[in-house]
Amino acid sequence: KKKILANGLTVVVNRDPVSKLAAVNILYKAGARNENPERTGFAHLFEHLMFRGTRRIPNFDLPVQMACGDNNAFTNNDYTDFYITLPKDNVETALWLESDRMEGLDITPEKLETEKRVVIEEFRQRYLNQPYGDQPMLLRALAYKVHPYRWATIGLTPEHIAQATPDEVQAFYRAHYRPSNAILSISADIDEEKMLDLAEKWFEPLANRPAAPDHIRQEPVQTAPRREVAERDVPATTVSLAFHMGGRTSPTSTSPTWSDLLAGGDSAALHHLVKSSGCSRR
């Protein structure tokens, strides 16, 4: 069942009679594409900040652990997703926690500086100090020229995170972490009407906030091949190819399936072709 609360929050519930666990997921329609090109990496930074507690609940993980639960999150270009899995009898603990940090995240300068250091170190380890680490970034910048898909969720450069001010971070939170920009889903062996009632109890009192302006630019159609050669101190040469496809509702939305068939692992067609040609020693 699906319901939109008075403050704009979309709630989707599903009764699962098999599991004794409840899965509570909240998706914010705020990803890397919603960032200022001069301040990239904010969506991923918030994935970290959202676990740093609120004024009412300073330690987010402790109540989850006391409820015998687990939690995590991930960010991509289109959205940021948070989830908690715990025994169904403790489902309100998850709703309490998620509703609290949707409105009352405590972003102190000290917490911000700590998470900025963590994210910058992650950037360096995974993308700058690792062989081939910057290859996906080079490919993105080649494939997209104006659309924000041209940068990864980690951001364009560590300096964007290093230079982020508390006011800029707070503005991003207020603009994107609001009821009408989120989807709450609950799956548990609980009556669906009961789950909707619980969602209303914990989330409907939250005030909505004005929507952030959408400045996402349309990517021009690519009319000619693009190539880039980057010289790096790496053990072997690698080649990456990328092809534009239609949106998720277009017939070409099956492209990820073809990608898996062609290049998804040792049994894929391209792997056999490269190996049989003698170009690869693997």
Regions found by a protein language model. Give the residues of each.
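Serine-centered coil/turn micro-motif
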Residues: Q130, H147, T249-S250, S267-H271
